[in-house]
Swiss-Prot record:
It comes from Neisseria meningitidis serogroup A / serotype 4A (strain DSM 15465 / Z2491). FAD binds at residues 327, 361, 391-394, 409-411, 424-427, 604. This is Sulfite reductase [NADPH] flavoprotein alpha-component. GO terms for molecular function: flavin adenine dinucleotide binding; FMN binding; sulfite reductase (NADPH) activity. HAMAP family: CysJ. Keywords: Amino-acid biosynthesis, Cysteine biosynthesis, Electron transport, FAD, Flavoprotein, FMN, NADP, Oxidoreductase, Transport.
Length: 604
């Protein structure tokens, strides 16, 4: 090609008018980004304007986007992440929003900006949907994350020793793998709204500024999807619960049992509340009036003394009854109360975190007052307490079977401390204080991480102990109502066959009707050698492996600290023994089941 061939034969562009130059000098980064895109679009259609059509695209800047992930056990982390995503989009930032149950863990290596909102379960473990990512980040194949910027919001309960542990672990591990922190981690307690809003506002402001520096094109402002604007299951929700009526409260353990388990039936007529097997019911409750009187007497406070609670001025007795947490002690309460008590022993307890955690777990608030008397005003005492929070119970019914009812399987918490009888807040309310036709405020808490297979022909294996059998009653009711072809296998454990066989006649009827195809029961105290569900799982290794090869889905419900861990260890033994895999292969197989949503757990 000659020099002449390389010369531009297009006419020279005219000089830019000075007023245009002046206008352009005043544009900010976002306006420049918009204008460049606009000019590019016009250039692409520029033949009519006498401009040459460009044959090759100019390189464009990588779009400024943020991935917002949530790992939720009860739905709180999901709702906070949804709100954060909406806030970022309103600020003109492009957002990719996902729940970790729908997110491929290996994609983390390609992320550039990541926000994670996570709760904590059990003894500091990540929520079920975050397990695969947590294992990847802490395993041999952990990716380098040196191109990632991140921020973490942890949700937890400070009455437990490993407060917000999952959030802390993710935050630390991201940094260890080379990622750069956008914002310091925030750990939010049960009353998380203010902390979560502050974190969201700060991260939105920071990213908006970062987007401007990068001259990124802002995403168009959008309104939240309809599902985020209103409660998905009718207008009633956590903030506006439905005043339901108690239909039945039946003890379903024998008189001789050490356990007091109640079958609770609640009327949802007129609520338009809908739920699916696997969902939970949120229950708001009032504290025991006797406990309120005991506390006020110990403090020497008149019940009629008025304080602020719930945005109102109320007698302190009413406020403690309905607005403050009295049955779950916290480190914050003990640390705040200690200066009023002026007791060296309590000061030593409050100063040692390990001792403090043990003390909080074993000593109810009222018994702190008994042991370490103090005088403080009603306002001062209320200022040490957390707001009352609802309790969540796995729903033990299917609406396909019970219609406008919802059933719960509630273990009443009862114990003695220093000779004084104590009871759980919500379980005591449901079992002892709520009368038939009495009102209980409820809402549905979705649990999309604990769902029956979409294909009802798939077999399911249900593993539960104690009240962990609750969702499986709902599962089998649903399968029976649909006349589902899929086989159902139940593993259930409790101390005694004669005293603790929850829903015995119903399981027998399901088996007779062809909807419970296999069942294995473990009665831990009916013989000298204790037998648990994990032992039954190992006994049935070949059968379980065969069901897995047929596409079975496995569900586990129960105690996270002990039972769920022991069951997972047993499942790994099954995969190693019957599946002929080594330990690493078994772990990978179980992770594959998790990612395929064929291994789901509802643990607490």
């Amino acid at each position: 090609m000659s020099e002449h061939d390389m010369q531009n034969t297009n006419p020279p562009l005219p000089p830019m008018p000075p007023e245009i130059t002046q206008l352009l000098s005043g544009l900010d980064a976002a306006q420049w980004a918009w204008l460049s895109g606009y000019a590019w679009a016009k250039a692409g259609n520029g033949a009519s304007a006498g401009l040459p059509a460009l044959q090759t695209a100019l390189p464009t800047a990588e779009p400024f986007s943020v991935t917002v992930l949530s790992a939720s056990q009860t739905g709180n982390a999901k709702s906070v992440a949804d709100k954060a995503a909406d806030s970022l989009e309103a600020a003109g930032i492009q957002v990719s929003r996902a729940e970790l149950k729908d997110y491929k863990a290996k994609n983390i290596a390609g992320e550039r900006r990541l926000l994670l909102v996570t709760s904590t379960q059990g003894e500091g473990e990540p929520p079920e949907e975050a397990v695969v990512l947590h294992k990847l980040l802490n395993g041999k194949k952990a990716p380098k994350l040196d191109k990632l910027q991140f921020a973490v919001l942890g949700l937890g309960d400070s009455s437990y020793p490993n407060f917000c542990r999952a959030g802390k672990d993710f935050d630390k591990r991201f940094e260890e793998l080379g990622a750069k922190r956008l914002l310091e981690r925030v750990d939010a307690d049960l009353d998380f709204a203010a902390a979560a809003d502050g974190w969201t506002d700060n991260i939105a402001a920071l990213l908006k500024e970062e987007a401007a520096k990068n001259r990124a094109t802002p995403a168009p402002q959008t309104t939240p999807p309809a599902g985020l604007q209103t409660a998905p299951d009718g207008r009633y929700c956590k903030a506006d619960p439905f005043p339901a009526a108690l239909l039945a409260n039946q003890k379903i353990t024998a008189r001789q049992s050490d356990k007091d388990v109640r079958h609770i039936e609640i009327d949802l007529s007129g609520s338009d509340l809908h739920y699916l097997p696997g969902d939970a019911l949120g229950v708001w409750f009032d504290n025991d009036p006797a406990l309120v009187r005991e506390i006020l007497d110990l403090l020497g406070i008149d019940q009629a003394t008025e304080i602020q609670a719930g945005g109102k001025t109320l007698p302190v007795a009413s406020a403690l009854l309905s607005h403050f947490e009295l049955t779950q002690n916290t480190p914050a309460f003990v640390k705040g109360y200690a200066p009023f008590a002026d007791d060296d022993e309590l000061d030593r307890i409050a100063a040692d975190n390990a001792v403090l955690q043990g003390f909080v777990q074993s000593t109810p608030i009222a018994d702190v007052l008994h042991r370490f008397p103090a005088k403080l005003t009603a306002e001062q005492f209320a200022g040490l307490l957390r707001p009352l929070a609802p309790r969540l119970y796995s729903i033990s019914s299917s609406q396909a079977e019970v219609g406008d009812e919802v059933h719960l399987t509630v273990g009443a918490v009862r114990f003695e401390h220093e000779g004084r009888a104590r009871a759980g807040g919500a379980s005591g309310f449901l079992a002892d204080r709520l009368e038939e036709d009495g009102t209980v405020r409820v809402f549905v808490e979705r649990n999309d991480g604990f769902r029956l297979p979409e294909d009802s022909r798939k077999p399911i294996v249900m593993i539960g102990s104690g009240t962990g059998v609750a969702p499986f009653r709902a599962f089998v009711q649903q399968r029976a109502a649909e006349n589902a072809e899929g086989k159902n296998w139940l593993f259930f454990g409790n101390p005694h066959f004669a005293r603790d066989f929850l829903y015995q006649t119903e399981w027998q009827q399901f088996a007779k009707d062809g909807f419970l195809h296999r069942y294995d029961f473990a009665w831990s105290r009916d013989q000298e050698e204790k037998i648990y569900v994990q032992d039954k799982i190992r006994e049935q290794a070949e059968g379980l492996w065969q069901w897995l090869q047929e596409g079975a889905h496995i569900y586990v419900c129960g105690d996270a600290a002990k039972m769920a861990k022991d069951v997972e260890a047993a499942l790994l033994d099954v995969i190693i023994g019957a599946g002929h895999l080594d330990e690493e292969g078994a772990e990978e197989y179980l992770d594959m089941l998790r990612e395929e949503k064929r291994y789901q757990r509802d643990v607490y």
